[in-house]
Amino acid sequence: MFEIRNLEKTFRLHNQNQAEIPVVSNVNFNVQAGECVALTGASGSGKSTLLRLIYGNYLAGDGTILVDGTNVVGADPRTILELRRTTLGYVTQFLRVLPRVPTIRVVAEPLLQAGCEVDAAEERARYLLEKLRIPENLWELSPLTFSGGEQQRVNIARGFAYDYPALLLDEPTASLDPANRQTVLDMIIDAKDRGCAIIGIFHDEAARRTVCDREIDVTHFAAAA
C-alpha cells in the first residue's frame, strides 16, 4: 500500500541567503495492507516531515512515494486531492476547519466528499462522536469552541469517518484520558483488521506495543541527510 524509495527532503530558507537544511535522505520502506508501522526518533528527526511528504503537503526533493500505486512525488494537485478523497486519510495533531461549521458536519465531510448520502454520513458521524464521548449538545456547535481534548477527538472522528485504505496518524492518543485512549487504540486495531495500512507517530510506548507491528527509526534517515 505504501512504498517509499530513495526519498529526500531539504528545506531551503529563502530569507536566509538560500541556506539549506537537509531533513531526510535515502528513505526506503514499505507498509502492507493491514499493517501499522510506527515512526520513531528524537524530536526534530523528521517524523512529522515524513508524514507531510507522504500526504503531499511538502514537495520531495527526490525519490518515490507510492500510495496504492499513485506516486505522490510530482503528482498534480487534482491527483493529490483525489488520493485524499478516496484512499489516504490523515489524523493530524491539530484541528483545522472553517469557523461556524457544526461538528457533526466536520466529521461527516470526508464521507460527503466521497459521495456518501447526507443522512448516512451524518449517522456515521453521530456514531463516532458518541463513541469518542463528545456530548451530544455540542454536535451542532463549531469544534473551534471546544477544549483541546475535545478538538482532538473530533479530529480523530473525522479521520476515521471514511474507511480509507491508508492512514497517517500523528500522535492520535496524545493528551487523551484512559477511556478515550483505549477507544482510539481499538479503532486503530479495527482499521488494521479491515486491511488498512497505517503509518503513525506514537510517543506513547504502550500504545505502540498495542497497535504497531514494527518500528522505523527515522534518525537513520536524518543522519544520512
Give the residues covered by each predicted segment.
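Conserved ABC ATPase "signature" region
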Residues: N71, A120-N137
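Conserved ABC transporter NBD signature motif
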Residues: G63-N71
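Catalytic Walker B motif of ABC-type/P-loop ATPase nucleotide-binding domains
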Residues: L167-D170
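Conserved ABC ATPase signature
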Residues: S142-F146, E150
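ABC ATPase C-loop
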Residues: G159-F160
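Helix-to-loop junction immediately C-terminal to a conserved catalytic motif
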Residues: Y55
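Q-loop/switch helix immediately C-terminal to the Walker
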Residues: V101-L112
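ABC ATPase NBD coupling module
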Residues: V72-G89, D193
